[in-house]
Amino acid sequence: QTEMARQHDAGMISYRIDASSFPGAYGEMIEETNVLVANHIAVKMQVIALAQRYAIGDLSQDMPLLPGEKRVITDALDAAKANLGAINAEIKRLEGAAAAGDLSQRGNVAGFEHDFADMVAGLNQLMQTTDGNLAHVSRMLRAIADGDLRARMEGEFHGVFARIAGDANTTAAQLATI
């Protein structure tokens, strides 16, 4: 047992005691110990395999319902899957709203914790910034359509929104000279 413990501590989790080296009942006890160790390692490997699937976004598999005190493993993986599914659903909901032109939608930050809450808050900021900047463009175009060629996009814009603001203001200025 000492050698098995040493091997497992060193990362050699496949190591087993040679039960054939022990006669009779001792050999049977060793074999039963090997089976016990193998069963514990099998559960760990199931957890690892499932975590690897979840890590790449494959939520199609579940952890089998484990008995007794091992049930905490099933419960933990079920919770991980549920939380990953919830953040995925929230992202898809916001993406669908944005694709449909509804930038007023916001994610439920309070429904998540830690980095998931940060992700939803970041998506909310993206939706809000995009909605606000496009509202500026819309107001300016509406003003120009109503004949107000003095309309300008004013405010702090960045990136593509700064370029749009500059182009819109230049367009209004050019139209005013006609």
Briefly describe each language-model feature range.
Residues 2-177:
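Polar/charged heptad-repeat coiled-coil helices used as signal-transmission/dimerization stalks
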